[in-house]
């Protein structure tokens, strides 16, 4: 019996979530909520979504047993949910596809998005091209520089990419600019938020579209292993890949571990470990944990991974932390790079730097467990986009 039923009708996960936006957006969000409530239980909408996930995105993604790496580490077996094998190379397309289908049904001709690592931008540009929609992507200028390949992909796909020069010039600033655009152009524009943050109904909607990850995993684990894993491990920036894996498992007793970016260490001010070091506040339309100073001002974050470099986190993760249902830990840049190289070496898989944080935690946990234990890691994306960053960190030029 399903007992977990959050958010409530106002978008709250306990004290988190909700709607904290300018008056000009209230009616747009209410319309979005009504339309989403209508279509989330609409058989035709769900059938089209399932069809697109299968025939365009390439789902289901397999679960792969990383045997050589598991043997090298000793202890538990590491299994990978291969979201890197989706069209466009990450989990982001699951949500972008769902929201694009909703936008079409709402009669919107233009989509906008924010992006950090560029994967959500690429996914949004991809579905916009698929459906013939105008597309504008907001991206912090720092991220434009470190994710140049993804910027070019977006442009190839027909999107206009607008570099954001304000603030720390990263994901939170891109989100601010996208919100401003939406306020101005709400009549014809649909804002495809890329993570489980923002005002209600976005955290719920993005979670629901990403929950295909966990639903597939439940079926695949039963078919391939005759049981479910002992722990689920996923990286957390905003937290959409993690909640996509966790949500279908929430009523079980399976251990859930979210892995944040500890950057140069949580004892420094150069990290993005929101749940580890932050405290509650309001940002981007919802109440959640934030990295802020004593005056409540958002502090600049750091991670080698552009997709984890965010000072907030999805409100559902804030609730899962407080309730004790999920645990959250930090992994440093250095530890993530080590896991990145290990997966390349032992398994012939180049992971995204975001996913490498989850892999690094699995590598720490596995040796402490017996060999009959199964750790399911969400390999949220592939690492092609991170080649320049990894090369720089390794003092290699090409």
UniProtKB/Swiss-Prot annotation:
Belongs to the TrpB family. PROSITE patterns: TRP_SYNTHASE_BETA. The gene is trpB. It comes from the Bacteria. GO terms for cellular component: cytoplasm. InterPro entries: Trp_synth_b_CS, Trp_synth_beta, Trp_synth_beta/beta-like, TrpB-like_PALP, TrpB-like_PALP_sf. This is Tryptophan synthase beta chain. Its cofactor is pyridoxal 5'-phosphate. SUPFAM superfamilies: Tryptophan synthase beta subunit-like PLP-dependent enzymes (SSF53686). Tetramer of two alpha and two beta chains. Keywords: Amino-acid biosynthesis, Aromatic amino acid biosynthesis, Lyase, Pyridoxal phosphate, Tryptophan biosynthesis. The keyword Protein biosynthesis does not apply. It is an enzyme of class 4 (lyase). The keyword Lyase applies. Gene3D superfamilies: 3.40.50.1100. One of its GO terms (molecular function) is tryptophan synthase activity. Its EC number is 4.2.1.20. The modification N6-(pyridoxal phosphate)lysine is found at residue 92. It comes from Nitrosospira multiformis (strain ATCC 25196 / NCIMB 11849 / C 71). Pathway: Amino-acid biosynthesis; L-tryptophan biosynthesis; L-tryptophan from chorismate: step 5/5. It catalyses: (1S,2R)-1-C-(indol-3-yl)glycerol 3-phosphate + L-serine = D-glyceraldehyde 3-phosphate + L-tryptophan + H2O. The beta subunit is responsible for the synthesis of L-tryptophan from indole and L-serine.
